[in-house]
Design a protein with these regions (language model features):
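Compositionally biased terminal segments of proteins
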Residues: 1-183
Length: 183
């Protein structure tokens, strides 16, 4: 695992501008490629910071106006903030958040889902990039597969629209991880 100690450009300038907009502490619960690349060291392109939560909610509109796809900060830096509404995180994910780049910003607090929770947010979409991210995380952490299964069963499965499909997806993911470990 090769996490970044310093945010590279254009991320640093983009997030510094968001930090200046915030009058008090703002927490961004980050998921997706931004977390996998910046915190866990995967080398792949990403142009957005996927966020599950902007807290307090009162700043979400201000952030949306300037930082979303097509907004002024996107025009300036080519990266954007994406408020994700379709990814389902495990129920207790907030209890396991970890801060990314502590003390980098005055008001902005970037929080990352733990690697198991991060992987499980990718379960429903299950595109190739998601599967590659999960296999990468499973390799570098390395995942305890029983913990992944348990968290899925207890904290995610009860809240899914099609749990039987996601049962199969998780089973296939675990088989792929086990194959990677055997080779």
């Amino acid at each position: 695992m090769c996490p970044r100690k310093v945010l590279p450009e254009p991320w640093l300038s983009f997030l510094n501008e968001l930090d200046r907009i915030a009058a008090s502490t703002v927490r961004l619960d980050c998921i997706g490629g931004f977390v996998v690349t910046m915190l866990y060291g995967l080398t792949r392109p990403t142009a957005d910071v996927d966020v599950l939560e902007i807290a307090p909610l009162s700043v979400a509109d201000a952030f949306s106006k300037v930082a979303m796809l097509g907004g002024p900060l996107f025009q300036k830096y080519g990266v954007y903030l994406d408020r994700v509404t379709v990814a389902q995180p495990p129920y207790e994910y907030e209890t396991r958040l970890q801060e990314m780049f502590p003390r980098t910003f005055q008001n902005l607090c970037l929080m990352a889902l733990d690697p198991y929770d991060l992987a499980l947010t990718k379960l429903e979409r299950n595109i190739e990039r998601d599967r590659n991210d999960v296999r990468y995380l499973a390799r570098i952490i390395p995942f305890e597969l029983d913990l992944l299964r348990e968290r899925y069963q207890i904290e995610l499965r009860p809240y899914l629209g099609n749990p039987k499909r996601e049962d199969l997806t998780l089973k296939l993911w675990i088989e792929a991880i086990e194959e990677d470990r055997a080779s």
